[in-house]
Amino acid sequence: MTKDRLAALHAAQSDDEEETEVAVNVDGHDSYMDDFFAQVEEIRGMIDKVQDNVEEVKKKHSAILSAPQTDEKTKQELEDLMADIKKNANRVRGKLKGIEQNIEQEEQQNKSSADLRIRKTQHSTLSRKFVEVMTEYNRTQTDYRERCKGRIQRQLEITGRPTNDDELEKMLEEGNSSVFTQGIIMETQQAKQTLADIEARHQDIMKLETSIKELHDMFMDMAMLVESQGEMIDRIEYHVEHAMDYVQTATQDTKKALKYQSKARRKKIMILICLTVLGILAASYVSSYFM
């Protein structure tokens, strides 16, 4: 009896340990996904910040180009915005690459679960959004470069030194502002201001080209990632759309069924009422007959 009692206690203890282990695993799983979604929100917030900064950069570009003279304060604010974009973009890229590596490790281990699919979908969505924002930033930088070129070209025409696009590009490749001022006589204050503006625009272009080159590798890396994920996202969107169509069809069928059910119910009620009335009439007739 003592041995049997001891064995039962050991068995009960083993069951408790298994239940505890399962509970711990479940809690750990929930905690892992909570941490993942917190990371997703953090990345989304950083992408939104980059997007807001890109819009501010556009405003600064317009302010600089519309000003008759170079505003150093505005230019410094523009440089600060560009530095902030670069910092946040690098952080986003690093976090997305980290998620990508974790997903690849699980796929190599032949792990497949709903959580893995969720993480892949979230990663793809964030990557696409990030590439869209950075594409807009790249477009903004390129557009500003062209506008600066146009302003330099107009200013050179004012100083009596007209240039075409090819000549201007060659001048820009020199990387030296003095290329634009060679042979120009600065007799008036207006001429000096014009040349100063040309040099300022040239410096802007040089900074832009540096910024664009720094972002190029990041942009290509993320663009290739999104392209490789495109087919998967398209499949997800396809199934979601068809699921919505199915839900709408099912809803319509349900409404029809309810409508037919309601009609059938009304028919049953009418038949019961008729039978009741007929029963009352028959009873009245029989009772009057025997009386």
From Swiss-Prot:
Q: How does it sit in the membrane?
A: Single-pass type IV membrane protein
Any idea where the t-SNARE coiled-coil homology domain is?
195-257
Region of interest called Disordered, as start-end residue ranges on this chain = 1-20
Key words of the record: Coiled coil, Cytoplasmic vesicle, Lysosome, Membrane, Neurotransmitter transport, Phosphoprotein, Synapse, Transmembrane, Transmembrane helix, Transport
Assigned GO CC terms: endomembrane system; lysosomal membrane; plasma membrane; SNARE complex; synaptic vesicle; synaptic vesicle membrane; terminal bouton
Q: What coarse category fits the chief subcellular location reported for this protein?
A: membrane
InterPro entries, alphabetized? SNARE (IPR010989), Syntaxin (IPR045242), Syntaxin/epimorphin_CS (IPR006012), Syntaxin_N (IPR006011), T_SNARE_dom (IPR000727)
Q: Name one GO biological process term.
A: mitotic cytokinesis
Q: Where in the cell is it found?
A: Cytoplasmic vesicle, Secretory vesicle, Synaptic vesicle membrane; Lysosome membrane
Tell me the protein family, please.
Answer: Belongs to the syntaxin family.
Explain the purpose of this protein. Answer: Plays a critical role in several secretory processes, including cuticle secretion and neurotransmitter release, and probably assists in neuronal membrane maturation or the final stages of neuronal differentiation. Essential for embryonic viability and development. Required for coordinated peristaltic contractions. Recruited by Unc-13-4B to secretory lysosome-related organelles (SLs) that are essential for tracheal lumen fusion between previously separate tracheal branches (anastomosis).
Name this polypeptide is given: Syntaxin-1A
Recall the taxonomic lineage recorded for the source organism: Eukaryota, Metazoa, Ecdysozoa, Arthropoda, Hexapoda
Q: Which gene encodes it?
A: Syx1A
